[in-house]
Amino acid sequence: MENRKEFTFPSADGRTAIHAVEWHPAGEPAGILQIAHGVAEYALRYEPFARFLNAHGFLVVANDHLGHGESVAEGAPRLYFGEKGSWQHVVDDMYTLRCRTGEAYPELPYFIMGHSMGSFLTRTYLIHYPGTVKGAILMGTGQNPDAMLVGGKALASVLARKVGRENASDVVEKLAFGAYNKAFAPNRTGYDWLSVSEENVDAYIADPLCGGMASTGLFLELLDGMAFIKKPANLRHMNMATPVLFISGDRDPVGGMGKGVRAAYDSFRRAGVRDAELKLYPGLRHEILNEDCRAQVYDDLWEWIERHNG
């Protein structure tokens, strides 16, 4: 596409070339949105939303996280971040993209949006790199009880020792994602929880860069990240003046059908974030950007960005 530029930059892991995308508006940009995608997907899935923002004068950037899309080192497994602590490499890669883009447009307001796993990464980003964005959108996020995180990590650790961190386990996969689908039985597919839109679910299943079984190592890093962003002592490192929008479907199992999203929102308010908003769409599931009513979601997101772009 004429307005799309693809490039790579070195990952914080020291071995992977991170694939990234820029979508440029027709004229001079009025602002920037950086997107952090979810697990088992990739940056180019966000092109329709990026083009929508381009039409409003925004530059959009996104990268494929380690082990996703085209950010897979030669000989490395897919859906694997790396050794223990590699969650931070993924967050640092997000910051590298932010610096690279910000240096090219230092005067422009810079926003960040994370979906699903990308929302947990973005919450980590807000703790480690406070004050580097004008606003943050947390889409498809959640907050699990400590007991669930501890139990999940114990099981994933045992299975990682059995099959290797870089390999997947169907036990972990079924516990993590199989439970999501139970709320929508009888199931048409294994991914009904993603979307009310059957067209979107089918497109996801047909996409060779989507889905698949994540490594036990990725699950361990994700669980560590989710535990880190829950701790009040860590939340206090955020810039409390940075506005944050929590936005999800109220039938999204990642967000506990809205309960986990509210818990995350409440934790930000308790930490002292002065401008936090919560929006839940009745009946929508995980991928609200890809539902049949996505035009309304796009408009709502733009309204929030525009309101905070002054």
Segments the model singles out, each with a brief description of its role:
Residues 33, 37-41, 116, 250-251:
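Active-site glycine-rich loops that stabilize anionic/oxyanionic intermediates
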Residues 246-248:
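Short beta-strand/loop motif that positions the catalytic acidic residue
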Residues 122-209:
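Alpha/beta-hydrolase-fold enzymes
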Residues 82-103:
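Alpha/beta-hydrolase active-site loop
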Residues 105-116:
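Alpha/beta-hydrolase fold nucleophile elbow
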Residues 1-27:
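N-terminal cap/lid segment of alpha/beta-hydrolase-fold proteins
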Residues 48-76:
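Conserved alpha/beta-hydrolase
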Residues 271, 275-310:
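Catalytic active-site module of serine/aspartate enzymes centered on a nucleophile-bearing elbow/loop
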